[in-house]
């Protein structure tokens, strides 16, 4: 299991990675998702933390600068921009949601992983140009907000600061308007 988690913790670059490695990672992520769904109550606290750390290694990444991306704003068009690695990201988010939504989930088991720095990085992902990712993030944020009482005040303050920074920058691209709308619906 440790080898699978280590392999899936590596983020692949589309230009530099082999397709067979990307396919192998997707297969292992699906296997980890099935394992999580079937065995979460029996998993040790350490194993659950390791799973969430693998998820964070996948989802927390530098985002392309929205303003500097060439071409029109991705949210202006009907054809929305998709994150090239959405297949892997989607599976990683689903693993996280499976853990957060499980009836036997104990938030205390993840206090060392799901903390203020985690929330900072999670909120930054709302600037992703991929609407699928922002939609998934809304659900993740809602589950964390509901489960981690100790992070609620921090989350409200950071969301307020995020919204104010977007508003005060004066740049009202459709993407930023969408970020405001997405975050505002959840908090």
Predicted feature residues:
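Alpha-helical solenoid scaffolds in large eukaryotic transport, assembly, and signaling factors
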Residues: 1-187
């Amino acid at each position: 299991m440790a080898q699978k988690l280590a392999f899936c913790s590596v983020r692949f670059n589309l230009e530099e990675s082999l397709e067979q490695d990307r396919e192998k990672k997707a297969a292992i992520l699906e296997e980890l998702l099935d394992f999580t769904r079937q065995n979460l109550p029996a998993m040790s606290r350490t194993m659950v933390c390791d799973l969430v750390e693998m998820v964070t290694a996948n989802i927390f990444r530098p985002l392309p600068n929205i303003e500097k991306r060439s071409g029109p704003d991705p949210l202006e068009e009907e054809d929305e921009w998709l994150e090239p690695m959405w297949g892997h990201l989607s599976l990683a988010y689903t693993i996280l949601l499976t853990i957060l939504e499980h009836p036997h989930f104990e938030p205390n088991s993840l206090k060392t992983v799901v903390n203020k720095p985690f929330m900072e990085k999670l909120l930054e992902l709302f600037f992703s140009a991929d609407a699928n990712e922002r939609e998934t993030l809304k659900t993740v944020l809602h589950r964390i907000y509901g489960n981690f009482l100790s992070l609620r005040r921090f989350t409200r303050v950071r969301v307020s600061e995020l919204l104010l920074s977007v508003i005060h920058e004066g740049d009202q691209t459709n993407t930023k308007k969408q970020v405001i709308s997405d975050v505002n619906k959840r908090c």
